[in-house]
């Protein structure tokens, strides 16, 4: 076999591999969108529950000290437990979808019964740990936003009752989002609009940011669960190494640190998603 034939064969094999990876990426992206739509209502349920508890606390603020305002606003431990109750089952289902997508493709070729164990120790352990981390992170971001808005209100000379009233539409947002709402309120107040009109516009803007935050959390956590499920699926069928695949238009970080890079399974855990809008996936390394 001469060099030209070998080169043609090599190019042909590379083309087949590239097509296979592109197909895998497209299928993974479709699976991610499907499961993201399923997770959004659950994230929304948790966020609405947290907002309801916080807004209830805002009706009882007279005796609250500014420095402990956020901590005393609600029973945060109860919110954490409710968040875990709502989110853990759905994240476990999404993890299973990622695992099944790998295992079923492999086992079908062997003409055996495809099965991914979603109730196995690794899957359940990940879901428990990750859900607790997620809920805690969301709560800490929410607390920090409240602290910053309380401090800003006091620095501006507002009463604690006035601060509580302005907090109502923004509890549950991140610091940046809450700051954007506060800035929007200030701009409206400069226009000397009626208070009722200002409150209506602020609430509409805040609700848009609440929806955005819910969608962003759902997108990120769907990617996390599917990625973990994919890795656990690879482990079940004996794959030892994986390769990262990024879209051609992915961000610089993903192109430099994930796309084409080879990882052991241990190294790959937690790599994807690299950021909230990350759409990278793992394929079995050749």
Model region roles, listed by residue range:
Residues 196, 201-286:
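Acidic, glycine-rich two-metal-ion catalytic cores of nucleic acid-processing enzymes
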Residues 1-204, 286:
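N-terminal leader/targeting and assembly helices and adjacent pre-domain segments
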């Amino acid at each position: 076999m001469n060099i030209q034939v070998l080169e043609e064969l090599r190019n042909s094999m590379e083309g087949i591999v590239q097509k296979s990876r592109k197909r895998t990426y497209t299928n993974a992206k479709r699976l991610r969108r499907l499961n993201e739509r399923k997770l959004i209502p659950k994230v929304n349920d948790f966020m609405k529950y947290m907002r309801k508890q916080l807004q209830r606390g805002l009706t009882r603020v007279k005796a609250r000290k500014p420095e402990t305002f956020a901590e005393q606003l609600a029973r945060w431990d109860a919110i954490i437990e409710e968040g875990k109750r709502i989110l853990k089952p759905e994240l476990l289902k999404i993890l299973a979808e990622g695992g099944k997508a790998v295992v079923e493709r492999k086992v079908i070729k062997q003409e055996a019964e495809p099965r991914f164990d979603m109730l196995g120790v690794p899957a359940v352990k990940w879901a428990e740990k990750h859900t607790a981390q997620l809920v805690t992170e969301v709560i800490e971001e929410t607390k920090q936003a409240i602290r910053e808005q309380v401090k800003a209100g006091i620095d501006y000379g507002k009463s604690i009752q006035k601060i509580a009233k302005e907090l109502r539409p923004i509890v549950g947002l991140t610091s940046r989002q809450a700051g954007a709402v506060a800035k929007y309120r200030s701009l409206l107040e400069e226009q000397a609009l009626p208070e009722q009109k200002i409150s209506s516009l602020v609430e509409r803007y805040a609700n848009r940011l609440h929806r955005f935050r819910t969608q962003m959390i759902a997108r990120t956590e769907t990617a996390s669960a599917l990625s973990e499920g994919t890795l656990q699926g690879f482990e079940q069928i004996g794959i030892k190494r994986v390769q990262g695949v990024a879209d051609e238009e992915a961000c610089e970080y993903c192109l430099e640190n994930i796309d084409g890079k080879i990882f052991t399974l241990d190294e790959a855990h937690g790599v994807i998603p690299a950021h909230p809008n990350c759409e990278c996936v793992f394929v079995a390394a050749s």
